[in-house]
Amino acid sequence: MTNAFNTSNSQAVFHAAQELMPGGVSSPVRAFKSVNGDPIVFDRVKGAYAWDLDGNRFIDYVGSWGPAICGHSHPEVIASLQEALEKGTSFGAPCELENKLAEMVIEAVPSVEMVRFVNSGTEACMAVLRLMRAFTGRDKLIKFEGCYHGHADMFLVKAGSGVATLGLPDSPGVPRSTTSNTLTAPYNDLEAVKNLFAENPDAIAGVILEPIVGNAGFIQPEPGFLEGLRELTKENGSLLVFDEVMTGFRISYGGAQGRFGVTPDLTTMGKVIGGGLPVGAYGGRKDIMSMVAPAGPMYQAGTLSGNPLAMTAGIKTLEILQQEGTYERLASITNRLINGICESAKQAGIPITGSSISGMFGFYLCEGPVRNFEEAKQTNSDYFGKLHRAMLAKGVYLAPSAFEAGFTSLAHSEEDIDSTLKAFNECFNELSQ
């Protein structure tokens, strides 16, 4: 990065964008409102780095919000895409590459016997909710406070992430009738889930959750929580759905369910399985997935679903992740990163709690533990905003929200971690004075 931290080109482009797009962005968190600043406008990305329009280089811990697990613009992924481009960008017809990626997903993810590709995580979660209801003949859904399952109406109830980032209540424009069948419970609270089942006998189609909450920061399941949900759903004739859009192929090759040894009935996926291109997927037990059209009566479709570019990038990304030592390396650098962040904060007298699993991490600027969204909201968001801006000036790009997980990649080097920890140490000391 340059000696003087200049973002004038980013500011000019963002100013112009505000006349063209709502808030100047295509997704709210990118506007930097949570950190009280103007966004950085990127020009290019490569490996562990991003460059803005002013030539500043940043060590990137957002990774396009999770997909860039191999690093940005991985040469093998780019080469595969260039070859695929010669054959066309979209067929709107069956594509042999769909078979290949489907086989890889089915082999890797314990719950998945059949899979359907879509274009986003939101789309996957919308479809899986319809499928839950179709299969069970029930209407109600249990979700957890702070878990985000996309921006579809029925999920915008205590949804964390973007809603928490903007400090807004659940979105206007969502009819009460749409969310009346959405029940909520605190994350890690099995007793609350038991009570909801007791209060709604034979009415709950299923329970959906992020097995690790990445859209309220980084909250891990307490021992027995996922296992308890598996038992409760079976006992009540309901389905268990893991939203692994963020954790799938990220915390282990088999996702959170592979890591924790708890197999849901259905799983939603995205991010990593598209290798940086727009993608989503949902899959699960064959008897449930057989209800999806055209095999069954539950309708779901998509113009660009299973397009050859997304399939190509996904296949190559998963092939890279299959290489020996991949997840051990991610765990090593990420563990060193979060431990160093927490140590620097504590030495500066700043309350902090943080943790990581594989290439995913998060921290809260408050005393721990943080087990649910209410406890996550105790984080010092004002301080985080100052920290975020200070880290940008030192060449480190963190998620512009205190309520988003961070990500490392195979491209991050030990030197990158060293530089990042040096910047954190300097920023904590400067801000504590």
Curated annotation (Swiss-Prot):
Q: Which PROSITE patterns match?
A: AA_TRANSFER_CLASS_3 (PS00600)
Question: For this protein, what is any one GO molecular function term?
Answer: transaminase activity
Q: In which pathway does it act?
A: Porphyrin-containing compound metabolism; protoporphyrin-IX biosynthesis; 5-aminolevulinate from L-glutamyl-tRNA(Glu): step 2/2; Porphyrin-containing compound metabolism; chlorophyll biosynthesis
Modification N6-(pyridoxal phosphate)lysine, positions: K271
Q: Which UniProt keywords apply?
A: Chlorophyll biosynthesis, Cytoplasm, Isomerase, Porphyrin biosynthesis, Pyridoxal phosphate
**Catalytic activity line of the entry:** (S)-4-amino-5-oxopentanoate = 5-aminolevulinate
The cellular location(s) given in this protein's UniProt record come to: Cytoplasm
Which cofactors does this protein require? pyridoxal 5'-phosphate
* Annotated SUPFAM superfamilies: PLP-dependent transferases (SSF53383)
**Which InterPro entries does the entry link to?**
4pyrrol_synth_GluAld_NH2Trfase (IPR004639), Aminotrans_3 (IPR005814), Aminotrans_3_PPA_site (IPR049704), PyrdxlP-dep_Trfase (IPR015424), PyrdxlP-dep_Trfase_major (IPR015421), PyrdxlP-dep_Trfase_small (IPR015422)
Against PANTHER family, the record matches this protein to: GLUTAMATE-1-SEMIALDEHYDE 2,1-AMINOMUTASE (PTHR43713), GLUTAMATE-1-SEMIALDEHYDE 2,1-AMINOMUTASE 1, CHLOROPLASTIC-RELATED (PTHR43713:SF3)
Q: Which NCBIfam families match?
A: hemL (TIGR00713), PRK00062.1 (NF000818)
The identity of this protein, by name, is Glutamate-1-semialdehyde 2,1-aminomutase
Organism (species)? Prochlorococcus marinus (strain SARG / CCMP1375 / SS120)
Q: Which gene encodes it?
A: hemL
